[in-house]
Amino acid sequence: MIVSFGDATTRTSEVQLVRCTQGLNLWKLHQVHAVYKRVVHDTLGADEGNALLDQILADTNLYPPWMCVLLYAFCSAMVTPYAFGGDWVNLAISFFMGLCVGSLQFILSQKSYMYSNVFEISASIVVSFCGRAFGSIPRSHICFGAVTQGSLALILPGYIILCGALELQSRSLVAGAVRMFYAIIYSLFLGFGITLGSALFGWMYHNATNEISCPQLISPWFRFLFVPAFTISISLLNQAHISQLPVMVFISCTGYVVTYWAGKHFANSTEFTAALAAFVIGVLGNLYSRIWKGLAVSAMLPAIFVQVPSGIASQNSLLSGLQSANTIVNANETITTSTSDPSSSMSFGMTMIQVCVGISVGLFASSLFVYPFGKKKTGLFSL
């Protein structure tokens, strides 16, 4: 974390680099915002506020690691049908594979610092290998693309790219450039892991599946069930309190409705669809902050997490590594896929940037729409 302290009298600034583990805790974020408002409005002293912040940092998380593993698996199961076109069988397989990835992230990575450095690559290798193995079972109706993307949806660097795009748009060039570059390399790691896992199974079983698209077997009306369920589970996974869930679910579902119908009319414009949905999400979140005095950023984040898998699914860019794996295993065989640039995993990173740039533009436009002159009494706690 890079913190800059400016001095208006001398026109100088001091930059401090704070080393801390990256994470998101929506309930503690709400508590910190409440302390901030009390200090700004002189209902609480600075020393007492500092003591409360230390107490908030020392408090344990609302949900233990084993519950986070179950929530991760449930998130993977819920995102598979509405974002990646999986059916009920793929939903069950995604839950099982989500358990494996969640165990690697919340249990093994927390115990081993060395493994945490290679978690993303190892998880993508395991998921792509197992997903292609399940998809190659004859007459199983298991879709390799759906179960693989659903299991990896929660470790996509969408939040990192979004923060980088927002910082670049607000002229924070150093922090934004660092985040964007890190997210691109992170995307390449995921693409390499998918390629390696798919190629390993292709070497072992020459009749491995090459299908990445799935027939839509579940009625679109079930999205009214899957999207709220995914929103609730990913909010709890990010340590949200139950009292925060109603507004999160409402904003998330409204944003997804905009994404769904905008995607019908702008099928080849992922960033424009993301910008429209982000604008609606930002307007609702900022109105929640302005009228009901809530915390906009915590109410909007789960809705943004819903948008990222939808944008990735529109181009199947996460599975661009499958074509590379087929090229490695079957050097003389030509296989056609639906990806826009299947020979390179860079297409995945570019799709992530397109989606997140669209989201950042929509969020800035929504803040300008609700707060055209900014907030005078306190800071704007929004995205």
UniProtKB/Swiss-Prot annotation:
Pfam families: ThrE (PF06738), ThrE_2 (PF12821). GO terms for cellular component: endoplasmic reticulum; membrane. Residues 1-65, 109-117, 163-180, 238-241, 293, 374-383 are cytoplasmic. InterPro entries: ThrE-like_N (IPR010619), ThrE/Ser_Exporter (IPR051361), ThrE_2 (IPR024528). It is a multi-pass membrane protein. GO terms for molecular function: transmembrane transporter activity. The keyword Magnesium does not apply. It is found in: Membrane. Coiled coil: none annotated. Keywords: Membrane, Transmembrane, Transmembrane helix. Residues 87, 139-141, 202-216, 263-271, 315-352 are extracellular. The chain crosses the membrane at residues 66-86, 88-108, 118-138, 142-162, 181-201, 217-237, 242-262, 272-292, 294-314, 353-373. Its main location: membrane. Signal peptide: none annotated. The keyword Ubl conjugation does not apply. It comes from the Eukaryota. Belongs to the ThrE exporter (TC 2.A.79) family. PANTHER family: PHEROMONE-REGULATED MEMBRANE PROTEIN 10 (PTHR31082:SF4). This is Pheromone-regulated membrane protein 10. The lineage of its organism: Eukaryota, Fungi, Dikarya, Ascomycota, Saccharomycotina.
